[in-house]
Amino acid sequence: MAKEGGRTAPCCSRPKVAALTVGTLLFLTGIGAASWAIVTILLRSDQEPLYQVQLSPGDSRLLVLDKTEGTWRLLCSSRSNARVAGLGCEEMGFLRALAHSELDVRTAGANGTSGFFCVDEGGLPLAQRLLDVISVCDCPRGRFLTATCQDCGRRKLPVDRIVGGQDSSLGRWPWQVSLRYDGTHLCGGSLLSGDWVLTAAHCFPERNRVLSRWRVFAGAVARTSPHAVQLGVQAVIYHGGYLPFRDPTIDENSNDIALVHLSSSLPLTEYIQPVCLPAAGQALVDGKVCTVTGWGNTQFYGQQAVVLQEARVPIISNEVCNSPDFYGNQIKPKMFCAGYPEGGIDACQGDSGGHFVCEDRISGTSRWRLCGIVSWGTGCALARKPGVYTKVIDFREWIFQAIKTHSEATGMVTQP
């Protein structure tokens, strides 16, 4: 596939450009033996470990792992249930909580050996994780919290696996959208919900800031598909630390991230679904093979792809990517590289803002998480010049804060 430059200049006027070439959850019953058996399953080591916050299947009890005891505890209900449910959902990588409720420990059968956590409500306003504000307790109110999070990162259609550099198929990447200015595809983006898209800041230079001329296309893999759903743009919130917007001569692409608020909400279907964010504290794993997609150029000087392209590429450590043979200390802490040392498969012009997604099972079921945003690179698919991505895990709080702060905003908005 191909990459659009992480700059405001035309994609071929400078060397740096961006784009894509060529388990079981704990179900508390109050019966000690049953609880212990389920905890044993949860802590099995043959798969990647479950994340430390979970929702139980069936009744969506909010569970937090007590690492000291090796057990899962329920969260006692409080006056701040809405905030606690929202914080729990966000921590797991969901965009928001859709609902919450209480269950009574005496009737729901959850007063077993696993125990409970209580919330320090005074610490909630500044908390970024549940573990910051909980402590073991006896649940004096006798009621505990359940939560419903906005679903994400799951395909609604069975799809075949494709191994890199090929046409994609409808429904494989239902969170991928096309951002078009005056009808021309300029960047990709990722749906976080029906009305929010995450993309790259460099997609919105001064010359492309008339929002009425932007349209977002979703639900299709063919760039010219008449069946795509399209919506207008209400606002673009870009990171205030993206320095080229302050001074176009600055050759520094940190904080290359922006949110697009749609004029209305897209209908969620088999072909339109949101992607998950990384869970709080979730680390990128060097060497892990993930997927980058886009409609960008299939060669550096080639044409844009007609059908959405996808490629599987491994994450490269920043140590390697900052070596003299690669990018020589140009990879900053909030960036990462992915690709092959020999080149051949990469992002390219037109893929900018698109997603780098990784699959995991830390929530007990398979989900795709948005780990990177196509940002920049040198050429396309060149040896030792892999694609460079914005590291989404480092912008989780920026994303949540921007959505909460600017949900009613219009036009171009800066979020520090």
Curated annotation (Swiss-Prot):
* Residues in the Extracellular compartment per record: 40-416
Q: Which residues lie on this side of the membrane: Cytoplasmic?
A: 1-18
Main location, first listed in the record: membrane
Q: What is its EC number?
A: 3.4.21.106
InterPro entries hit by this protein = Hepsin-SRCR_dom, Peptidase_S1_PA, Peptidase_S1_PA_chymotrypsin, Peptidase_S1A, SRCR, SRCR-like_dom_sf, Trypsin_dom, TRYPSIN_HIS
Q: Kindly list the cysteine pairs connected by disulfide bridges.
A: 76-139, 89-149, 118-137, 152-276, 187-203, 290-358, 321-337, 348-380
Catalytic residues, chain numbering: 202, 256, 352
Q: What is this protein called?
A: Serine protease hepsin
Source organism per entry reads: Rattus norvegicus
The lineage, from the top, is: Eukaryota, Metazoa, Chordata, Craniata, Vertebrata
